[in-house]
Regions:
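Structural/interface elements that position substrates and couple domains in central-metabolism enzymes
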Residues: 1-57, 70-87, 91-120
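Short glycine-/small-residue-rich Rossmann-like dinucleotide-binding loops
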Residues: 61-65
Length: 120
C-alpha cells in the first residue's frame, strides 16, 4: 500500500481528482488529499499543504494546471516522493527537469488509467 498525495483534490464527484481518491482507495492505496479549502473528501482527512502531511508520501499525483504549480514545487521536492504523476492537463517540462534533478521519477500519465490497467 502506497501513501499517495492527491494535489488539487476536489469534493466534487465528477472531478478526476475525486475519482482518483476513490479509485486509489479501491486499489488499497492510502490517498492523502491536498486542498486548501476542505476538511474532508471521500472520507479522507484533507491537508491544506504538503508540509502538513505527517506520513511519508510514496507518490504525488498532480491535478493542478501549470499556472498553479510553481508555489508547490519546492514542497514536492522537500517531500521526496519516489515519483510524481502529471495527469493530463498538468504537463510542465520546466518542473520535470527540477524533479529529475532531485532524483524524483516523473510520470506523464493518467492515474485512473494506470490503476485500471494494473500499471500503477
Amino acid at each position: 500500500m502506497e501513501n499517495v498525495a492527491v494535489i488539487g483534490a476536489s469534493p466534487k464527484p465528477d472531478r478526476y481528482s475525486n475519482k482518483a481518491i476513490r479509485l486509489l482507495s479501491e486499489y488499497n492505496h492510502n490517498p492523502v488529499p491536498i486542498a486548501p479549502k476542505h476538511e474532508q473528501i471521500e472520507g479522507e482527512k484533507v491537508y491544506r499543504s504538503l508540509k502538513d502531511i505527517p506520513e511519508k508520501i510514496d507518490t504525488v499525483t498532480l491535478y493542478l494546471g501549470q499556472a498553479r504549480q510553481d508555489p508547490i514545487i519546492s514542497d514536492i521536492i522537500e517531500l521526496a516522493p519516489k515519483r510524481v504523476i502529471f495527469n493530463p492537463g498538468t504537463e510542465n517540462k520546466a518542473v520535470y527537469k527540477q524533479l529529475k534533478e532531485a532524483d524524483i521519477e516523473v510520470v506523464e500519465a493518467c492515474t485512473l488509467v494506470l490503476l485500471k490497467t494494473n500499471r500503477y
